[in-house]
Structure formats: C-alpha cells, structure tokens
Amino acid sequence: MAWNQPGNNGQDRDPWGSSKPGGNSEGNGNKGGRDQGPPDLDDIFRKLSKKLGGLGGGKGTGSGGGSSSQGPRPQLGGRVVTIAAAAIVIIWAASGFYTIKEAERGVVTRFGKFSHLVEPGLNWKPTFIDEVKPVNVEAVRELAASGVMLTSDENVVRVEMNVQYRVTNPEKYLYSVTSPDDSLRQATDSALRGVIGKYTMDRILTEGRTVIRSDTQRELEETIRPYDMGITLLDVNFQAARPPEEVKAAFDDAIAARENEQQYIREAEAYTNEVQPRANGQAQRILEEARAYKAQTILEAQGEVARFAKLLPEYKAAPEITRERLYIETMEKVLGNTRKVLVNDKGGNLMVLPLDQMLKGGNAPAAKSDNGASNLLRLPPASSSTTSGASNTSSTSQGDIMDQRRANAQRNDYQRQGE
C-alpha cells in the first residue's frame, strides 16, 4: 500500500492522520501498522474538523505535543477568500444593469440625492449606491375633478371636469412637490371652484361651458406655475354640469325653451335667405322698369317737341286750322280712354253716353239693339237767370236748379237699370 511502502524512513503513512516514528498515529493510541483494526470514527471527525479549521489560515496542533505539517494550508485559504471576494464583486456588478423603456426617462439618485437623468436603453448603476426611478414622459395622464359648488347667484351645481397633462421634467415631477398628482388635483379643484363662483347657474348650464373651460385652464396654469412641478397641461374638458334634483325639471324646461328659440331663429334665418334674393330680384326689376319708363318718357317728350317744332311753320301759315286739328287730336286721345261721355245738345239737355255698355251692346243680337236708345239719359236743363259760359253749365247757378247730387244719383240709377 502507498502508506506502507519502503523508503519511508521506517515510518508508515497513516491515511487517517500524520505519521510519527514507530508508526504511532497522532491522537490515536493504536499503532498505524498492518496489525491495526478499523479506525475510530470520533478520531476521524476530530481530524476533519482540524483540517477544515486550517483552511481559514489557523494552525492545528497534534495530540501528544507533536505538530503536523501546516505549510500549504494558509495559501489555500487565501485563494478561497479571493475567489469568494471576486464572486461577490461579479454578482454586485451584474446586479447593477437595468433597462429604461423608450417612453421613459430614468431619474438617478446617489445616496438619496439627485444625480442625473438616463436615456432609454441598457444602463448600469452601482448597486446600493445609486437608485433609479423610471418616469414615463410620453403618456398622456388624466385627472378627474368633480364636486358640488356654489354659483354667483347662490345656487348649487354639481360640476365634473377632466384634466389631461404630460410629464415634461422628471426631476421636478418627483422632487419639486411631495405628491404632484395630488397637488394637481387640489389645484384643479380650487381653480374650478373659483371660476364657477363667478357665473350664474343659468349660464353654467347653458351657453357658458366654453368660457368656463378656458377660464379654468388659465386659472389652473397660473396656480401651478410657482410650484414648477415639471408637468404641462394639454387640455381641460368641461364634462358635465347638473342642477340639484329638486329643480332639475324646471331647468330642463328652460333649456328646452332656449333650444326652441334657437330653432326658430334658424328657421327665420333660412326664410330670410330664401326671400331676400327674390325681393332683391323684384327690386332690381322695378328699377329696370323705372329706367325704361324714364327713357321712354324722355323720348316721347323729345318726339313731341320735334313734332311741335314741325307744326310751327304750319301754325304760322294757318293758325285756326292748326288749332282745330290739335284740339280734335287731343280729344281723340282723351275720349279714347273714357267710358262715359257727357253731351250738351242744343235743347239744353245733358246726355250721358255710357260707351262701355254701348260697345257691349254692339256685340249683342239685333233683337236687343232696339234698347240702345234707352241707354241715353237726358237730364233736365240747368236754368239760370243769366247766361253763363260753356264751362259753367255743370255748376250751380242762382235760382231753382237741381242739386248736383240728385243728378249723380239719377245717373247711377240709370246705369244700374241699363246693366
């Protein structure tokens, strides 16, 4: 056996411990020769404990005052410590790698104090020294605010509003205020209450929604600006405004009335748009007719002037004949449009000729033509004490003269009988 080979200087190698001269094992009263029995288990465990203790650089002492060989044990212990330290360093370094998403920015703090920002991708930090908090800077965040608020006319209305914002500065978002979302909610509630208190309930529920939305956004921006929370307001949506249930029916009626008013206004505007072009066309047509009539009248007047200019030599040659001819032409024009003609015959009777009825009777059969003479109305002569001109025959004179009204009545009665 390897522990019982020659050349060992008379010493046998004991596999359970260090050998001693004479083949005695350390700490064991039995001999280490071939005649030895099975080793003692207690002795084996004791020696293993000494060896394990020697790995840490300690020195073991053998029983009986003898010292075993301790040369390689300190070197082996140093290697183990180095390997363990290296493993710890590797694990520490590997644990420092982390990833920031594309929509995020990393806020790095060193021993609790802000250090720097990191971009998206794979990054490294010293573990237990730096701490990284990722913040999403691209997502649109929403915050809802609602509550029962008092209006300027001392009414109560329930208002709901939605605020949309985005984080633009991660450092200020995390460390400017304790809780940025809660601070923004409180600022929104304060701004909304301030704006609602400026308007009446009637305007809030009807046409004032756009104005309230813009005023609330402006007030909210002015409120959060001193805090520099690192956020940007994107939009403020005025979602709903409801009156209390006790008066909701009355407000619904008022809203319906306003809607009807707007409907009637739109219908009136549509009617105006329809009628106005037609009226403009008629007005333009009347203007064109007036211009045409003006031009026609001017041309007729110019024609009359030219005609009289041509008649002037004839009038100078024969004044009486020319005057008579002009009189006859004028009477033809005047009597051509007259339905009744009054004729004063030589007997002093005034005849009325209803030309329209006579023209109608001319188209009737011959059997009825005998009644044409009855269409003539003879009035009694107008007596006067003195002779008057032809122009005064129809007027009242001194004496007993028939009243002109009676004469007119008789004419009307005759006209009705003739019809």
UniProtKB/Swiss-Prot annotation:
Give residue spans, biased composition: Polar residues: 1-10
What quaternary structure, including any partners, is listed in this protein's UniProt entry? HflC and HflK interact to form a complex, originally called HflA, now called HflKC. HflKC interacts with FtsH; complex formation is stimulated by ATP, and with YccA.
The miscellaneous annotation reads: Integration of this protein into the membrane depends on SecA, SecY and SecD but not on SecB or FtsY. HflK is unstable in the absence of HflC.
- Periplasmic side, ranges: 101-419
Which InterPro entries does this entry report, sorted A to Z? Band7/mec-2_domain, Band_7, Band_7/SPFH_dom_sf, HflK, Membrane_HflK_N, Stomatin_HflK_fam
Region Disordered: what ranges? 1-75, 364-419
User: What is the protein's membrane topology class?
Assistant: Single-pass type II membrane protein
Which keywords does this Swiss-Prot/TrEMBL entry list? Cell inner membrane, Cell membrane, Membrane, Signal-anchor, Transmembrane, Transmembrane helix
Similarity remark: Belongs to the band 7/mec-2 family. HflK subfamily.
Q: Where is the composition biased (Gly residues)?
A: 53-68
Pull the Cytoplasmic topological domain ranges from the record: 1-79
Report the protein name in the record.
Answer: Modulator of FtsH protease HflK
SUPFAM superfamilies annotated for this entry? Band 7/SPFH domain
Q: Does the keyword Lipoprotein apply?
A: no
Q: Does the keyword Kinase apply?
A: no
Source taxon at top rank: Bacteria
- Residue intervals passing through the bilayer: 80-100
The record's subcellular location field reads: Cell inner membrane
Q: Which organism is it from?
A: Escherichia coli (strain K12)
* Cellular-component GO terms for this entry: cytosol; membrane protein complex; plasma membrane protein complex
Give the compositionally biased regions (Low complexity).
383-397
Instruction: Output the GO biological process annotations, alphabetical, semicolon-separated.
Output: response to heat
Q: What does this protein do?
A: HflC and HflK help govern the stability of phage lambda cII protein, and thereby control the lysogenization frequency of phage lambda. HflKC inhibits the SecY-degrading activity of FtsH, possibly helping quality control of integral membrane proteins.
Q: Which Pfam families match?
A: Band_7 (PF01145), HflK_N (PF12221)
